[in-house]
């Protein structure tokens, strides 16, 4: 009985919704047919505040159709709009007053749809966003400003500002809607003005919150900024949401250098604030590919990267990529860089998520043949000591890594040829020393690799046995070993070819004394 009542109520509600949608269509037709029906616009806008999701969607579509026609027919007042409640001078005609009134209704409509960006239904949020971007496109094509306006391009920056302000909420997570907005960032003009507006928004929130950015706001800003892809060449700039109708050589949205400049500015103002650990990691993960290459002056990131490198742990590992670019491509001088890199070699380095990335970068940093011998020896020795407690999948990468260091620096061969190899008790190497220059690694030997020759895993033993033979000049390729896992080792063992049968004695043993033919078994029974 209750189920029947529920179905009946749903049918009644659906009929009401259909009736409201039909009413919206009727009012839209009436407004477009005659100016005498203009007051019906209020009824259309009222439906934007409905509690029914489907009615709100219908109202958004109706309002979009209405003002699209109004903009195309130039039915909205163009120029500085007087206040609605103010007294208008007699110089304005009835035509002007009607267009002013309709322009105010358009502004009210845009404000209502902006509020819907925070609607409980994502479908309504998405539709509201697409409608607002449609308004931006139409305003660009049919400007609401006088032709004497300074910006000859007349991009509707003000409406875009309101959209961005609603996407970058301080308390509500808008990352899903920002992801939907990402497709509009493919338009070069939208991308450029989004960056300028975001820069202003971050500055405004910063002043409001006494130089501290709320965590949710930071997440929203990062989601938006990380969605921005700057073209590599200026010739790629030509995709505009608002059609370009002027030929202005100084038009900034068409200049790659201006894109890079504002891109750099907005990232710098965002990164100067303290970030959460998770956000720190996200920024560093994309820094070397998505941020540094598109900055006018990548060296401006020195302070951020050096501060991140000094944090320690995973943050320091992730900062290596950016530092590598600045050191090798932009001649950054970092006096204690290798000392810090050396200090990152801890047992935990073998178990972190970014292990492969770290050793890939460490291999590049240690590839120079101009490094001091004591420094390379310290890295080789520290890795060898850590290898004593490392899992097999890591050892298969660490041992060739150490051997490559020795190949690059023949002076380090003393570490594997020194007669007095010693052991843990007599080893002069100081594991606790953070300064590689004071670790006495060059006075030690790589006896740890000899210990690994007794490892339980056969592949590790074969890798460690390399030092028992003369090292070849050709370096080992460790790229395929950086991400090897224990599961891969296990699968490899399981796939090894097994003997179909094991040869056994064909005559079974009887008793403790062996076969029946044995002389002892013939005289004694057990």
Curated annotation (Swiss-Prot):
UniProt subcellular location: Nucleus membrane; Nucleus, Nucleolus
Predominant place of localization: nucleus
Keyword line: Membrane, Nucleus, Transmembrane, Transmembrane helix
Pfam families: CBF
Membrane topology type: Multi-pass membrane protein
Regions that span the bilayer: 307-327, 358-378, 386-406
GO cellular component, one term: nucleolus
Record-level GO BP terms: ribosome biogenesis
Similarity-based family: Belongs to the CBF/MAK21 family.
Protein name according to UniProt: Nucleolar complex protein 4 homolog A
Originating species: Xenopus laevis
């Amino acid at each position: 009985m209750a189920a029947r009542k529920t179905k009946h109520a749903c049918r009644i509600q659906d009929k009401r919704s259909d009736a409201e949608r039909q009413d919206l269509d009727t009012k839209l037709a009436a407004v477009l047919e005659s100016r005498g029906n203009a007051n019906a616009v209020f009824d259309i806008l009222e439906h934007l505040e409905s509690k029914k999701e489907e009615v709100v969607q219908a109202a958004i579509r109706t309002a979009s159709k209405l003002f699209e026609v109004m903009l195309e027919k130039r039915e909205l007042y163009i120029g500085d709009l007087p206040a609605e409640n103010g007294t208008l001078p007699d110089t304005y005609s009835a035509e002007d007053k009607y267009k002013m009134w309709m322009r105010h209704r358009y502004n009210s409509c845009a404000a209502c749809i902006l509020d819907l960006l925070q609607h409980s239904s994502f479908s309504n949020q998405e539709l509201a966003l697409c409608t607002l971007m449609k308004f931006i496109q139409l305003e660009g094509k049919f400007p609401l400003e006088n032709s004497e306006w300074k910006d000859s391009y007349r991009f509707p920056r003000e409406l875009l500002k309101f959209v961005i302000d609603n996407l970058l909420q301080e308390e509500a997570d808008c990352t899903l809607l920002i992801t939907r907005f990402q497709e509009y960032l493919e338009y070069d003009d939208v991308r450029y003005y989004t960056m300028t507006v975001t820069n202003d928004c971050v500055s405004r929130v910063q002043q409001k919150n006494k130089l501290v950015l709320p965590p949710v706001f930071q997440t929203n800003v990062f989601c938006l900024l990380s969605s921005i892809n700057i073209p590599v060449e200026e010739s790629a700039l030509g995709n505009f949401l608002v059609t370009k109708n002027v030929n202005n050589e100084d038009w900034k949205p068409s200049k790659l250098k201006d894109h890079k400049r504002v891109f750099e500015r907005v990232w710098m103002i965002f990164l100067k604030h303290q970030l959460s650990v998770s956000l720190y990691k996200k920024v560093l993960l994309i820094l070397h590919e998505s941020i540094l290459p598109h900055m006018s002056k990548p060296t401006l990131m020195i302070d951020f990267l050096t501060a991140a490198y000094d944090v320690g742990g995973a943050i320091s590992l992730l900062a290596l990529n950016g530092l590598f670019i600045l050191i090798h491509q932009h001649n950054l001088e970092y006096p204690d860089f290798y000392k810090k890199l050396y200090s990152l070699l801890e047992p935990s380095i073998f178990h972190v998520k970014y292990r492969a990335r770290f050793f890939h970068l460490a291999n590049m940093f240690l590839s120079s043949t101009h490094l001091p011998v004591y420094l390379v020896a310290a890295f080789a020795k520290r890795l060898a000591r850590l290898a004593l407690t490392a899992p097999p999948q890591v050892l298969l990468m660490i041992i060739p890594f150490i051997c490559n260091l020795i190949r690059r620096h023949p002076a380090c061969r003393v570490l594997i040829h020194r007669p007095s190899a010693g052991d843990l008790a007599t080893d002069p190497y100081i594991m606790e020393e953070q300064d590689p220059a004071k670790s006495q690694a060059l006075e030690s030997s790589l006896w740890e690799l000899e210990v690994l020759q007794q490892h339980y895993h056969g592949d590790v033993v074969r890798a460690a046995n390399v030092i028992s033979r003369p090292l070849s000049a050709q370096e080992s390729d460790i790229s395929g070993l950086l991400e090897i896992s224990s599961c891969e080792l296990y699968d490899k063992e399981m796939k090894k070819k097994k003997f179909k049968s094991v040869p056994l004695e064909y005559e079974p043993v009887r008793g403790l004394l062996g076969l029946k033919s044995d002389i002892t078994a013939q005289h004694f029974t057990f």
